[in-house]
Amino acid sequence: MASEDTLSSNPLLQNFDFPPFDSVDAHHVRPGIRALLQQLEAELEQLEKAVEPSWPKLVEPLEKIIDRLSVVWGMINHLKAVKDTPELRAAIEEVQPEKVKFQLRLGQSKPIYNAFKAIRESPDWNSLSEARQRLVEAQIKEAVLSGIALEDDKREEFNKIEQELEKLSHKFSENVLDATKKFEKLITDKKEIEGLPPSALGLFAQAAVSKGHETATADTGPWLITLDAPSYLPVMQHAKNRALREEVYRAYLSRASSGDLDNTAIIDQILKLRLEKAKLLGYRNYAEVSMATKMATVEKADELLEKLRSASWDPAVQDIEDLKSFAKNQGAAEADSLTHWDITFWSERLRESKYDINEEELRPYFSLPKVMDALFGLAKTLFGIDVVPADGVAPVWNSDVRFYCVKDSSGNPTAYFYFDPYSRPSEKRDGAWMDEVFSRSRVMAQKGSSVRLPVAQMVCNQTPPVGDKPSLMTFREVETVFHEFGHALQHMLTKEDEGLVAGIRNIEWDAVELPSQFMENWCYHRDTLMSIAKHYQTGETLPENVYKKLLAARTFRAGSLSLRQLKFATVDLELHTKYMPGGAETIYEVDQRVSIKTQVIPPLPEDRFLCSFSHIFAGGYAAGYYSYKWAEVLSADAFSAFEDAGLDDIKAVKETGQRFRNTILALGGGKAPLKVFVEFRGREPSPEPLLRHNGLLAASA
């Protein structure tokens, strides 16, 4: 047991305005989390003894317990994602079961559950605000889904399943991370990497230096290729060496599918336990459990996926035909038998020839500082907010991390956020994400203020600046920053003071991508894009004809790209509805079966993409991957409100932006998302704008 002295100085246990990211270390985790859980356990017992079906005697003390745990656990989990060390990983792994045990105990508290039911059944129910009613109903539903209504022996079985699932998903993502790190290909002959742009060669040389090849340079090598996205993608897009593309593709596709890092058995066990959990709760399959907290139903999700699939199939077949004839014209020996490691490469060549756009040549026009300035400028126009640097106000975990304050039109702070832009392959996980640090809350307000302001963190994995050259971005990375900022806006601009339903909390999962995907649409809006795209050396604006090509390129291979996402969504639903663990069909056979209708080029027999499908086995998207498409329908339709108003009519754009802010961004989880959408749009969502934006409308007509 840690001594009182060491506990009193443990940063995880202090009161703080902002998390002490700079002073938390692996050795703080075990004693800190254990002491915190002990403290929260005592508070929970106290609450259960004194609970009454009222806000002050139930919701407020409960929010304090939930908040403290989510803030502290969020802090160490965040550090694991951005500053991973074996020590931190081991410490978190050790205390994770204890934290899950406490969460289960909290989620299955009969006194709390009964008090919420009493509020639900009281004569005062109708006088509660909609947000408070949503909060109560969410707590009751969550309790039922966490096994509260089960008999003792069944509840014990349920809890074992939950513990085991937590462990398995944890192990799943570690295997993916380790398998990704494990692959290294050192290249000493420049001929082998012909076609790769200087930015990629620079990255490969940096990777080589970090592995002990001190003299490596972009020009002379050696170059180290890894499976991290900033390394993998350029190889698939630009390497003329077909054998290299094949080797890297096969390695990427078979990550975590063999040896000690094989995720196959883990996936089977996860699916088996999820099905058992569903049956215990009285559902037929796990997809029904997942949909219990979503806007959609299994049937509605299936229906949407099929509608989009049938609109995408013929265009996707045409895409492959176009690629084949283009490759043939270029004299490619493989033209008639294009396969997986050729598609990205030849698509990139076709895109360059058709739209004369080379992603790499566009990079100088998208420097990170300019992109952020334009993004903040857009947020001011649409939502009337100012984003101002506040570096130094809060501790950070790396010197590259920026800190910002969001102010309303009167200049009052309304939120804060961290931004961690660059890739650090040895310690930071791939991808981009937004997470909450604090949610807006009346109950958690410091003395002297009426509400605690929300704080978010945005994390990306862009190419770091090299020398005096700023971080230069691909257009896709620009879209990613806009996307994550959309999530952050919904977290930060909430007007909801009930902490448990503020911001992104309690928003149905399939509606949560609406603001993020909505923001991506602005990257194609001429004035917005032109305010971003300034050459970092000359200041020259992106030429008009290039903008037109970018716009046209938006629908390039839309059928194929749509099918790819539909494949992920469909295989996810199949595995969580029809698949029987231990039955006649293996997970890979399910994948192959789904692919018949969703992949024009059938997958390789040895395709093991499921082994690194972290979204559904380690990331909360189980039987929920369809929600990306569901939200694309919502976001395209929301953006079409601005198109209807007139994108060049600044007054109309501001008015529509204000309406978007007052509904979709402000109401948080305090109102059902369909109601919120109808309040903004004046009607229910339609898939038509999405198909129109993707150039697939004619195909579906």
From Swiss-Prot:
Reported regulation of activity: Inhibited by salicylic acid.
Location in the cell: Cytoplasm, Cytosol
Principal location: cytoplasm
One of the Pfam families matching this protein, by short name: TOP_N
Cofactor binding note: Binds 1 zinc ion.
Keywords recorded for this protein, A-Z: Acetylation, Coiled coil, Cytoplasm, Hydrolase, Metal-binding, Metalloprotease, Protease, Zinc
Protein name in UniProt: Probable cytosolic oligopeptidase A
Organism: Arabidopsis thaliana (Mouse-ear cress)
